[in-house]
A protein has these predicted regions:
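Signature aromatic-anchored transmembrane alpha helix within multi-pass, membrane-resident enzymes
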Residues: 2-8, 215, 219, 329, ...
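Transmembrane-helix motifs of polytopic, lipid-linked glycan transferases
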Residues: 7-10, 81-107, 145, 305-308
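Short hydrophobic/aromatic helix or loop-helix immediately within or flanking a transmembrane segment
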Residues: 32-38, 51-74, 263-283
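Membrane-interface micro-motifs in multi-pass membrane enzymes
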Residues: 54, 58, 104-151, 350-362, ...
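Short periplasmic/luminal acceptor-recognition loop of GT-C membrane glycosyltransferases, typified by
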Residues: 55, 423-460
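Membrane-interface helix-loop-helix junctions at transmembrane boundaries of multi-pass membrane enzymes
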Residues: 105-108, 193-212, 282-333
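Hydrophobic/aromatic-rich transmembrane helices and adjacent perimembrane loops
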Residues: 134-142, 179-180, 288-305, 322-378
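Membrane-interface alpha helices of multi-pass inner-membrane proteins
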Residues: 158-184
Length: 496
């Protein structure tokens, strides 16, 4: 029953999320991974010649794009399909992890609570964050599946080994997993070992499972680092420096804290402040009356409040051997946010992509922690009233999701120029980052625009999300330039 129901829900959610994703135009950030997946699909498994951003997604979303392109080819819609598929699976994985070992009605409530919190991304910036190009969200999917294994599987020797393999695989593509999974797992397990030794006089041998998980977490970083260096030694992709590793000035921390809180509200759909201020950087109304949009965002505060409640309750189980996953998730939120706030990338709400794991982790904690606490309420009528309120809130979430999915799809600004370029036999040119890779993806590779940086006297190759052979005059030739309105999102035009 659970399998059939999950498959049905997954199919419905995928098409709804696909519609919602299409309401936010694709950008070059997503096109980068689409082109890398296309290159990988055509045999360049190590992405030789590529210079990639500080987060490569080499083992997460890039293979996902390759699989999609295997069946569909290189198309403009690949970004939306990948985003919808990832988020659909993430919602279901969060629900299953929140369910734990519960069955029947209790299991359904836990599943619905976690999935319900995530089910309706806020129309606008949150849609872009959760349903568009890779932004660390896809990293959370294999991590949730690993936590599901730790939650359900017996304590056998091969479980830490499997966890180490998953962590290594994910860290290769996204080092944020060190903050959200590997580090927290090592901290919680090490603390439990130390507590058991000091409090209960337990030997290290009797705690082999926890020690094995600590070792798996630590070794996953070493194995991932070794793998990345091996790829480099084999002339695979190169990585640009990590911008987020730099710290912000101390006087900017209050603004960073404010932006972090705003980003978390936004990813939970509870960003009514930017709606009420009519900010272009926050949620969009899409024709919805302002009062309704603010009220709907305020309702999402219910989900955020439940996640916060579950987050704090999870620390009660920090040393409880019956529940390993909950304190690890809560610790992951703490470490991720603590590393994010003082960094240079936390100045604006849309930078919350660096802490996007807070959404699925918080939703899971709400599902695992809150129903048990509510079940202990003494009065039956109070429980019934809360159940009706919960159903009503979920209905409002679904109504908001349906409204967002019903909006008109938005084509990116570069699609309109492609037919004109092809009609004039202009198929190899130069452009800046916002349009270059996006045009290549939109055209299915028929039009090649190569990213450059314009200096006062010439153009130079831009070694960022680009491939070295594009700039080899023996293989490439450019006879026109694509520009747009200050390269800030206007419609593109070509200059031969």
């Amino acid at each position: 029953m659970w399998l059939a129901g999950s498959v049905l829900v997954a199919v419905v959610l995928f098409f709804v999320y696909l519609r919602l994703s299409r309401t936010y135009a694709a950008t070059s950030d997503g096109a980068d991974q689409a082109l890398q997946g296309w290159d990988m699909l055509h045999g360049n498994w190590l992405l030789r010649g590529w210079t990639i951003a500080d987060v490569t997604y080499y083992t997460t979303e890039v293979p996902e794009y390759a699989i999609i392109e295997l069946f569909r080819g290189l198309r403009a819609d690949d970004v939306h399909i990948a985003g919808a598929a990832t988020y659909t699976l993430l919602v279901l994985a969060a629900g299953l992890l929140a369910r734990g070992r519960s069955t029947g009605r209790e299991g359904l409530i836990r599943f619905a609570l976690a999935a319900g919190i995530m089910i309706a991304p806020q129309f606008g910036n949150a849609t872009h964050l959760l349903l568009s190009q890779p932004d660390h969200l896809g990293t959370s999917l294999p991590l949730l599946l690993m936590f599901l294994m730790l939650d359900r599987a017996p304590r056998r020797w091969y479980i830490p080994v499997a966890a180490g393999v998953v962590l290594t695989w994910v860290v290769i593509g996204d080092r944020v997993a060190l903050l959200t999974a590997a580090g927290p797992l090592a901290v919680v397990c090490a603390a439990r070992v130390l507590f058991a030794m000091l409090r209960h006089r337990r030997s290290l041998a009797s705690q082999w499972y926890e020690l094995s998980l600590v070792a798996a977490s630590v070794l996953s970083f070493a194995a991932a680092e070794l793998t990345v260096r091996l790829i480099g030694a084999l002339h695979g992709y190169k990585i640009t420096p990590v911008e987020s590793a730099r710290m912000a000035m101390l006087q900017l921390l209050p603004r960073h804290v404010q932006a972090t809180v705003g980003g978390i509200r936004n990813m939970y759909g509870a960003d009514f402040i930017h709606i009420s201020q009519n900010s272009p950087f926050g949620p969009q109304l899409g024709g919805l009356p302002l009062s309704v949009g603010v009220a709907l965002a305020a309702l999402h505060f219910v989900g955020l409040a439940l996640a916060v409640w579950g987050f704090f309750r999870a620390f009660r189980y920090f040393f409880d051997p019956a529940d390993l996953v909950s304190p690890v998730l809560a610790t992951g939120i703490v470490i991720n946010v603590a590393a994010y706030v003082p960094s240079v990338v936390s100045a604006r709400i849309w930078d919350a992509r660096e802490i996007v794991a807070v959404l699925p982790f918080g939703a899971v904690l709400a599902g695992r922690m809150v129903p048990g606490a509510l079940a202990r309420l003494p009065r039956r009528r109070v429980k019934q009233a809360l159940a009706f309120v919960g159903v009503g809130v979920l209905a409002c979430y679904l109504a908001g999701l349906g409204f967002g999915a019903a909006q008109s799809p938005q084509a990116d600004n570069e699609q309109a120029v492609i037919p004109w370029l092809e009609a004039h036999h202009l198929t190899s040119g130069l452009g800046l980052y916002p349009e270059a890779n996006l045009i290549v993806m939109d055209s299915g590779g028929r039009v090649a625009i190569r990213t450059v940086t314009w200096w006062s006297w010439r153009a130079v190759p831009r070694a960022y999300e680009s491939e070295a052979s594009w700039y080899d005059p023996r293989q490439s030739y450019a006879n026109f330039v694509v520009t747009n309105s200050a390269d800030g999102g206007g419609a593109s035009r070509a200059v031969a």
